[in-house]
Amino acid sequence: MPNTNPVAAWKALKEGNERFVAGRPQHPSQSVDHRAGLAAGQKPTAVIFGCADSRVAAEIIFDQGLGDMFVVRTAGHVIDSAVLGSIEYAVTVLNVPLIVVLGHDSCGAVNAALAAINDGTLPGGYVRDVVERVAPSVLLGRRDGLSRVDEFEQRHVHETVAILMARSSAISERIAGGSLAIVGVTYQLDDGRAVLRDHIGNIGEEV
């Protein structure tokens, strides 16, 4: 899956997910020759910024292979300077045309943030930092009348997209110029489907 443009990149990921959902993955970009060729450098087509949940393995659910995607994962897809730097590297140095924010259902980080807001239950250690970074999305969702857990999970994806735009001029400038797009996706654990929830920039379709 070579470097292309936002529309082609999103199309390739959608088609890969459709193969995965149907149980007909092609496992591309995994041959011995392809692996050896990557030693000279990488040209991924998409950045996946997703949750670190073990059930949400990006290369598998989008049926991609070695060198196809630049993957950054944190619990609850929370953002810090290291995340921003990693994504900006992919965008500015590798010229990746698409960023995918990948959330999912049954997200422990979102559920923990809901528990913290509802009854004051906060975990210890650095897990607390993760929960505190997710909590603003939950509070914004509650302000807007959301009540179901899946609604809060989708809202957190939306807010993550917005934060990337607001905090990184490298991202926002390339989106304005048309060379980059961001999509927000939620992954459904039971059927394996990656559902488009949000996007900024042209990806060839609307939500």
From Swiss-Prot:
InterPro entries: Carbonic_anhydrase, Carbonic_anhydrase_CS, Carbonic_anhydrase_sf. One of its GO terms (molecular function) is carbonate dehydratase activity. Zn(2+) binds at residues 51, 53, 104, 107. Binds 1 zinc ion per subunit. It holds the Pfam family Pro_CA. Active at pH 8.4 and inactive at pH 7.5. Its cofactor is Zn(2+). GO terms for biological process: carbon utilization. Its EC number is 4.2.1.1. It catalyses: hydrogencarbonate + H(+) = CO2 + H2O. Inhibited by sulfonamides and sulfamates. Keywords: Lyase, Metal-binding, Zinc. The keyword DNA repair does not apply. The keyword Metal-binding applies. Catalyzes the reversible hydration of carbon dioxide to form bicarbonate. Belongs to the beta-class carbonic anhydrase family. Homotetramer at pH 8.4 and homodimer at pH 7.4. This is Carbonic anhydrase 2. It comes from Mycobacterium tuberculosis (strain ATCC 25618 / H37Rv). The gene is mtcA2.
